Amino acid sequence: MASDSGNQGTLCTLEFAVQMTCQSCVDAVRKSLQGVAGVQDVEVHLEDQMVLVHTTLPSQEVQALLEGTGRQAVLKGMGSGQLQNLGAAVAILGGPGTVQGVVRFLQLTPERCLIEGTIDGLEPGLHGLHVHQYGDLTNNCNSCGNHFNPDGASHGGPQDSDRHRGDLGNVRADADGRAIFRMEDEQLKVWDVIGRSLIIDEGEDDLGRGGHPLSKITGNSGERLACGIIARSAGLFQNPKQICSCDGLTIWEERGRPIAGKGRKESAQPPAHL
C-alpha cells in the first residue's frame, strides 16, 4: 500500500465538473494546478465545464485546489490508465456520532485497487479502516459482520500476505479531526466488495502485532465509529448527469447537501427578499 497522501502511488485520472463561463475561468483553473507536486497533466474543456486531472493526489486535495479559484467543483468519475473500466465504487460513511466521510475505490489493474477518501470528525491520530462482510446497517455499524475474510486468515496489516482481505490498516486524522488518504492494495478487488461495508474505528489497528486477545481478530482498534455500504460508482465519462432525476437538483445545488433526507431539500442559501 502507498502512503496516506502526497504524490506517491499510481497515476489516475479524476473527472471534475467545474463552473466555468469564459477563458479567464480556464486560465484560473490551469494556474491553480500548475506546478503542484503529484499533478502530471490537466485538461480543461470549457464548453463541457469539464476538467480532467492526471494525478497521484487524493481527489479531495485536487478539489480544494480547484475550488480555491472561487468556482464550484464536483468529482464525477475516476479512471486508471487501462483502456477498459475495471470497476469503481464509493462508500458514504456516517453513524450515530459526528464522524462522516466519503471513500472511493478504483480498480487500477486486475491486481491493484486504489482506496482514497476523506473522513471528518475523528480524534487526532490513527484509526483502523476495514471492509466488513455485510452491507447491513439495520443496527448501525454493529450489523456489518466481521472483517471481510473469504480466505479464513488471521487479522494482519495491509502489507502482510496472511491477513483479512478487508484489512486496510490505519488512516491518520490531523489536529482538526480530518483524515485525507490515498492507498493501494493488492488483495482487495472492487468486484468483491460492492454490497459490503466499510467501517472506520475508534482507535489504532495494531495490525495483529499487539499481543491483545483481539489483535488477531480485529486489530484491537476499538468501537466502530462510522460505516457505509460500498456501492458501484461511475468511472470516467460514465456520469453525464447535470440534473438529478429524483428531485430536480442540479449538480451545483447538490454540492454540500446530503444525498438523502430532509437536509437535501433545504436550500444552503437563505431565500431572496423580493
UniProtKB/Swiss-Prot annotation:
Binds 2 copper ions per subunit. GO terms for molecular function: cadherin binding; copper ion binding; protein-disulfide reductase activity; superoxide dismutase copper chaperone activity. The keyword Ubl conjugation applies. Its main location: cytoplasm. One of its GO terms (cellular component) is nucleus. It holds the Pfam family Sod_Cu. The modification Phosphoserine is found at S267. Residues 11-74 form the HMA domain. Cu cation 1 binds at C22, C25. Residues 88-234 are annotated as: Superoxide dismutase-like. This is Copper chaperone for superoxide dismutase. It comes from Homo sapiens. The gene is CCS.
